[in-house]
Amino acid sequence: MYNHKTVEKKWQKYWAEHDTFKTGTDPKKKNYYALDMFPFPSGKGLHVGHPEGYTATDIVSRMKRAQGYNVLHPMGWDAFGLPTEQYALKTGEDPEKVTKENIANFKKQLNKLGFSYDWDREVTTSDPNYYKWTQWVFEQMYKKGLAYEAEVPVNWSPDLGTVVANEEIIDGKTERGGYPVYRRNMRQWMLKMTAYADRLLEDLDDLDWPEPVKEMQRNWIGRSEGAQVTFKVKDSDKTFDVFTTRPDTLFGVSYTVLAPESKLVQEITTPEQKEAVDAYIKKIESKSDLERTDLNKDKTGVFTGAYAVNPVNGKEVPIWISDYVLASYGTGAVMAVPAHDDRDYAFATKFGLPINRVIEGGNLEKEAFGGDGKHINSEFLDGLNNEEAKKRMIEWLEDHNVGEKKVNYKLRDWDFSRQRYWGEPIPVIHWEDGTTSLVPEDELPLRLPHATDIKPSGTPESPLANLTDWVNVVDENGRKGKRETNTMPNWAGSSWYYLRYIDPHNDKELADYDLLKKWLPVDLYIGGAEHAVRHLLYARFWHKVLYDLGVVPTKEPFQKLYNQGLILKNHEKMSKSKGNVVNPDEVIDEYGADSLRMYEMFMGPLDASIDWDDNGPASTKKFLDRVWRLFVNDLDLKAIPQEKIVDENDGELDKVYAETVKKVTEDFEALHFNTAISQMMVFMNAAQKAKTIPREYAEGFVQLLAPVAPHMMEEIWSVFGHDESIAYAKWPEYDPAKLVESTVEIMVQVNGKLRGKFKAAKDSDKDTLEKEALALDHVQKFLEGKDVKKVIVIPNKIVNIVAK
């Protein structure tokens, strides 16, 4: 009997002692970088969802090593951030201690699964030797004007005691904890991601990423072309700009809308409307951007009492405020054309505002018309279609100095301040004379000071503000200053960790340029689709900044991205609160790591969400036990006697072996592991039925299965008499000629009725086939006493004998 407990421990110990998976550096070999999205080391440890993506990259890494590549396959920890801090607050423990314990537990669990990580390259984002370089990147951004301070409307979560980025809000609540979010103005550090909007958009085209992820990034960046138009406020010297993608509809404007928080609102509101305007502003101040811009919500708004003048026809139109207009998006003001825009139509219908048609088409009694058509009621645009009218209107606006062609983005700059303790300190000092300076590079890392009270202060300061010895500084001239007390978001360290794996112990620079040139971009990156517009966008942004600084040699970090699906339990996402988490340790204990790895790869396509079956690992264990019994004599743990595994080849397994090597290699490359495993099962069935198995095929099959079930295959490999690990044994190849059957079955008919069949060499000539057919005993029975008049032979198919 195969004992997974002893065999798995034995090989895990062997790999660790022999540094089996140390990253290769042979200059003659090609390089391959297989990366997992590193985990946040929570106290809960791994559940069976984690190993799915990890097993996939591990299989590819193991195959690539055997194919003669230098393989970089590292692992590390995304250790800063809210979850650890929340846990530490609840239990009173030190977040650093909690993090170290969680990492040790995670690492133990990962090693039990037999992953081929190079642990010499392990990184932890909360390690000062690591975040020294996170701070260094921030400093370079500051010097380039890409990191700046601003008073901005933010998403404030009192329950978390911090600001959260737009990307961290789901359905109007914080992604972490599901707490309500309120809008307020605060001084924040911002990263100028908008400066890279066009490149972030354009360079997506060159990436081998799932189309839905690319589409999510495109929508998040939200590039739109149109015009910026200046409206004057009636009876005043004030003006405001609107951005519109439909400048061709300017003649149809019947009102304008300002963001309620716009400074202009207070300046233009009439005394009669002031009370209503102030009440409305108070009512909406706690709403998040997402709530405010929800297309399905009821439209609300208030008239300011003021009017704007339409620059194209001099008509006066009322100025309203409404929460669907955001101060942070576009210009914070919109022109409304209810006849040709759904949102404007709903608003105008509710508040009884005019609906002026300027394009032919549709039924305005029922709904707005957004399609193409001939322009009407539009003076110099009459008779033109949409695109021609847009161009013509932009020319007119530019000629009259009341507008210009403009590109707008939905993407905002990245809110980079968090009012929490457990994060990278921002290396900035605010001086009493009002100036700001960076902590000198040679003094980095600016270490996070130890603190016992890490409760959020509930103010725009983080708990670091209480550590006065750390906060207060004096320069050599006696000038007093205070350190920045906000910390970086937990997305900071994960925006560049894949670079540090390439050169993890370098204390002179982030990573050596020549090494980066060898390994970048990442060849395969596997992780969850939930990171589409956060981590994956942030990392691309940082990478482009570093490219411009000459730190990295490529424009993009990750060439191929793949999202694994979720593993569900009872059709629901696994979570502690639902009590449906399956712990991999228990599965490994009962069935072995190889069975778990194989089951997770065999469940279905890697990118599908699939329900966990408690009997699944038992069925893959059954298959692996069959493999064991085919090759190993359980009594003495020696290879099966010579009569089954032989040095000669009778050709019986040629075709199925060639098919198996071909399909498994191609399917591993394409990440189609379930179909690769099915093909290995086909080979197993054939091998069990065969009288003998050529040694070359037995060993080749074990090598193909090794990336999926490495422990058992290492053991069988050593039983076959090999002293070295299977990890670097040359990957099997196949003879394409053997994909075609070397023999064919020939049907024999006598007077049109099937009377026999025989096997013959493929493409045998007619004479040979005729002789063979006539010699069959069963056929001769039907020819007794008859004369053979004619023999019709169709090579490779049939011999038809006509006899009378």
Curated annotation (Swiss-Prot):
Its EC number is 6.1.1.4. A motif ('KMSKS' region) lies at residues 573-577. It catalyses: tRNA(Leu) + L-leucine + ATP = L-leucyl-tRNA(Leu) + AMP + diphosphate. PROSITE patterns: AA_TRNA_LIGASE_I. It comes from the Bacteria. CDD domains: Anticodon_Ia_Leu_BEm, LeuRS_core. SUPFAM superfamilies: Anticodon-binding domain of a subclass of class I aminoacyl-tRNA synthetases, Nucleotidylyl transferase, ValRS/IleRS/LeuRS editing domain. Gene3D superfamilies: 3.10.20.590, HUPs (3.40.50.620), Isoleucyl-tRNA Synthetase, Domain 1 (1.10.730.10). Signal peptide: none annotated. It is found in: Cytoplasm. A motif ('HIGH' region) lies at residues 39-50. Keywords: Aminoacyl-tRNA synthetase, ATP-binding, Cytoplasm, Ligase, Nucleotide-binding, Protein biosynthesis. It holds the Pfam family Anticodon_1. GO terms for biological process: leucyl-tRNA aminoacylation. One of its GO terms (molecular function) is leucine-tRNA ligase activity. Belongs to the class-I aminoacyl-tRNA synthetase family. This is Leucine--tRNA ligase. It comes from Lactobacillus johnsonii (strain CNCM I-12250 / La1 / NCC 533).
